Structures are given as structure tokens and as C-alpha cells.
Amino acid sequence: MPNLAPYGSAKAGLTGLMRTLALELAEHSIRVNSVNPTTVATPMLQNPVNFGLLRPDLDDPTAEDVLPVYRTLNALPIPYVQADDIRNAVLFLVSDEARYVTGVALPVDAGYAVK
């Protein structure tokens, strides 16, 4: 897909910022982490413009038409995660169970990063 450089650069920059802040704020017992998801079932993903980018071979592709394309992105056989999956990761990171977790880019990515 064309024109992903700004998006990818911004994501990489945020990870660097998170790690730097985690180091700088650790002495104050402030934890800084990020959640790095794969594709998430949201309007940013599920819209006619994206459908057209993913299936240029079709005149008017639908959400159903792009599911096989999305499935190829992840190691687990799913097209995308749900917003609740991201929420659960955030709730874990802010919980006492993660009280010593800092500087972590937590993937909620169905194996996208290892594929």
C-alpha cells in the first residue's frame, strides 16, 4: 500500500518517546507503556477507501471482500482484533498486576509482529 511512510514513522516515533519517558520517569515511580495493536475493527479500518486499496481488482469492494486480505496480516487466523481487546490490554497495564511493567510496547496483534 502506498503512502504509509508518515503513519509508520509516527508509530515508531511514539514507541521511542514511550521508552524515553519510561526511563526518565521511572525514578518517580511513573510507568509508561504503549499498546501496539494489529488492525482493529474500527471505522478507520472498515471504510470504502480502505476496501478499495486492499481490493483494487473490484469496482465496489465490501467489508466481506477484504476479510481474506486482512487475515493474511496476522499469524492467528483472524482478520482483526476488536476494540475490547485493546481495552483489556490497557486495563492490565494500569492495574496493580502490572505495577512493575514499564517501557513495554505490548503487542495486541494476533501475531502480526512475528509473521
Q: Over which residues does each language-model region extend?
A:
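Short, flexible catalytic-loop segment of classical short-chain dehydrogenase/reductase
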Residues: 37-47, 51-52, 56
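Active-site helix of classical SDR
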Residues: 10, 18
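Conserved SDR Rossmann-fold cofactor-binding beta-strand/turn motif
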Residues: 31-41, 94, 107-109
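A short C-terminal helix-loop "cap" of Rossmann-like NAD(P)-dependent dehydrogenase/epimerase domains
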Residues: 50-75
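Short, small/polar-rich loop/turn modules that mediate ligand/substrate recognition or access, typified
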Residues: 26, 31, 101-103
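Short C-terminal tail/terminal secondary-structure segment
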Residues: 91, 102-115
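A conserved structural motif in NAD(P)-dependent oxidoreductases
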Residues: 74-86
